[in-house]
């Protein structure tokens, strides 16, 4: 685990086993994060090479330290949104993605991803971009907010929540917003299994970082970057991501689905890492090209 960007990789063994690592293979890690999966790829065989991407510069800076022995010779780092990566001139034996927010991003209160700490409403994975969660909350129309919470957060009380937000804005902090969301829903919902702000914060994060649009672009492009019989493995953390991956794999004629049902963490892994509970791993393989 990278101590400067501490993140416990989820479903690591299942992911590596599913990739069927090839000696001297070239692999693409679309979500470097704490570097756990990239490290496992590099350790799988002494000649394996990895290209790793992250839109969060702090993850890349941390990886330059934790994965220093592999840099230049076997590991290449690329900063940016994976949807903007041009892999047309590459040919990978495997591609992996561990989607969503990493533990450091959640735990660093100043990033504004969590309402457990008071922080500015930010939520940017790439802190060089301009749009923040505060921009959305304070400037979007009520209907736009309600639609956002419903579509990206699957929040059934999106309309009363949006109404309360518009009435009481502007907002500057995460806890201030979370309190208003909680006060706008019935008590039975307010004290339910999850905090009533959870789905709203998910929706805001997805919108700020254009997560679903980026994922759809990736699903359209990534199979073209695979060698014949190359494998793509993707870990999702909520139903919107999983649905896109499921149908993206199914509708691509160049892919054969390996996992008929998604692989989920074992009870042991869930006990050790509660954040893994919602993870789902889907794997597909590029169909072998016919020789003409």
Curated annotation (Swiss-Prot):
Keywords: Cytoplasm, Methyltransferase, rRNA processing, S-adenosyl-L-methionine, Transferase
Domain of life: Bacteria
One Gene Ontology term of the molecular function aspect: rRNA (cytosine-N4-)-methyltransferase activity
Residues that hold S-adenosyl-L-methionine according to the record: 35-37, 54, 98, 105
Record-level GO BP terms: rRNA base methylation
Pfam families membership: Methyltransf_5
Keyword check for Thylakoid: no
Catalyzed reactions per annotation: cytidine(1402) in 16S rRNA + S-adenosyl-L-methionine = N(4)-methylcytidine(1402) in 16S rRNA + S-adenosyl-L-homocysteine + H(+)
Annotated HAMAP family: 16SrRNA_methyltr_H
Function, in words: Specifically methylates the N4 position of cytidine in position 1402 (C1402) of 16S rRNA.
Name of the protein this chain belongs to: Ribosomal RNA small subunit methyltransferase H
């Amino acid at each position: 685990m990278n101590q400067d960007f501490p993140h416990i990789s989820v479903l690591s063994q299942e992911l590596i086993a599913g990739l069927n690592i090839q000696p001297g293979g070239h692999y693409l890690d679309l979500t470097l994060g704490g570097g756990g999966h990239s490290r496992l790829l590099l350790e799988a065989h002494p000649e394996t090479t990895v290209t790793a991407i992250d839109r969060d510069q702090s993850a890349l800076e941390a990886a330059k330290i934790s994965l220093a022995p592999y840099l230049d010779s076997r590991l290449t780092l690329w900063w940016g949104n994976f949807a903007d990566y041009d892999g047309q001139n590459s040919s990978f034996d495997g591609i992996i993605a561990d989607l969503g927010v990493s533990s450091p991003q959640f735990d660093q209160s100043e990033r504004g991803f969590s309402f457990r700490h008071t922080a500015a409403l930010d939520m940017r994975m790439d802190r060089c971009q301009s749009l923040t969660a505060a921009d959305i909350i304070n400037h979007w129309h009520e209907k736009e907010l309600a639609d956002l919470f419903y579509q990206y957060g699957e929040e059934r009380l999106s309309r009363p929540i949006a109404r309360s937000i518009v009435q009481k804005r502007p907002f500057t902090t995460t806890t201030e917003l979370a309190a208003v969301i909680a006060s706008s829903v019935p008590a039975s919902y307010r004290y339910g299994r999850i905090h009533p702000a959870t789905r709203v914060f998910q929706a805001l994060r997805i919108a700020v970082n254009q997560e679903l649009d980026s994922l759809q672009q990736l699903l359209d492009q990534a199979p073209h970057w695979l060698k014949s019989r190359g494998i793509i493995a993707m870990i999702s953390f909520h139903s919107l991501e999983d649905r896109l991956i499921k149908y993206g794999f199914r509708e691509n004629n160049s892919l054969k689905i390996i996992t008929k049902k998604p692989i989920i963490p074992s009870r042991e892994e869930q006990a050790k890492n509660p954040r893994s509970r919602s993870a789902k791993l889907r794997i597909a393989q590029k169909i072998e090209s016919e020789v003409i």
